[in-house]
């Protein structure tokens, strides 16, 4: 049988240790086609997914990646996919400043009131009820003081105000006798202090007589029918 095979030109091919046919290449690495063997696309075995370079050799088996001639996984690309996001934010700062000055103008209040006959003593009210009596002089000054106001006459200062009242009464009887007793001086002071202020009332009654007679005695002398009139 072997003679018939040799007669028809059956050629043997060189194989490696694994039984794969060995290809001869030239000095540039290009395969040299043999006299026999598989030719064309039918004799080509491709290993790999995609190849970039095409091989027009015959009877070749290509194993490996990125072969110059053959089909392999020669994947690459100019364009790569990467994520490098750059995020820049421009912050706009806003400042809030509230500088508000509050200035108040101070006010000084000065109030002076003069009331004539508002605060009368008990004896003055009695004399008004009796006809024929005469009050020579009655003077009443009522001055109100606030927390920031001061009157001319001075005095004390309360929390919300102070009222200072002074009453003077001078009675001259008709006879005007001057004895050893001289002058009778009566002074009454009433003070009322509360949360809303202070009230100061001063009443003075001056009576000139010779025998230290009381005010009621002088009033009785002026009344008709009492027998106290001397006719002087």
Swiss-Prot record:
InterPro entries: Dehydrin, Dehydrin_CS. It comes from the Eukaryota. Induction: By abscisic acid (ABA) and water stress. Residues 1-12 have a biased composition (Polar residues). Keywords: Stress response. Residues 131-140, 200-223 have a biased composition (Basic and acidic residues). Pfam families: Dehydrin. One of its GO terms (biological process) is cold acclimation. GO terms for cellular component: cytosol. The keyword Transcription does not apply. The keyword Translocase does not apply. Residues 73-82, 143-156 have a biased composition (Gly residues). Belongs to the plant dehydrin family. This is Dehydrin DHN2. It comes from Pisum sativum. The gene is DHN2.
């Amino acid at each position: 049988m072997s003679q018939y095979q040799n007669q028809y030109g059956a050629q043997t091919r060189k194989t490696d240790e694994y039984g794969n046919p060995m290809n001869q290449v030239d000095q540039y690495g290009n395969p040299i086609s043999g006299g026999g063997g598989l030719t064309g696309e039918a004799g080509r075995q491709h290993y790999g997914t995609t190849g970039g370079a095409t091989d027009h050799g015959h009877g070749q088996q290509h194993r490996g990646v990125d072969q110059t001639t053959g089909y392999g996984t020669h994947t690459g690309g100019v364009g790569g996919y990467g994520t490098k996001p750059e995020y820049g934010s421009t912050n706009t700062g806003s400042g809030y400043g509230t500088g508000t000055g509050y200035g108040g103008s101070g006010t000084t209040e000065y109030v002076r009131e003069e009331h004539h006959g508002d605060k009368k003593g008990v004896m003055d009210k009695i004399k008004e009820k009796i006809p024929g009596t005469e009050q020579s002089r009655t003077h009443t000054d009522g001055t109100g003081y606030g927390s920031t106001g001061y009157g001319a006459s001075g005095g004390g200062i309360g929390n919300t105000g102070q009222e200072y009242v002074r009453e003077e009464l001078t009675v001259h009887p008709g006879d005007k006798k001057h004895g050893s007793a001289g002058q009778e001086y009566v002074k009454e002071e009433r003070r009322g202090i509360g949360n809303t202020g202070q009230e100061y009332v001063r009443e003075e009654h001056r009576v000139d007589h010779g025998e230290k007679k009381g005010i009621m005695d002088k009033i009785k002398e002026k009344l008709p029918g009492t027998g106290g009139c001397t006719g002087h």
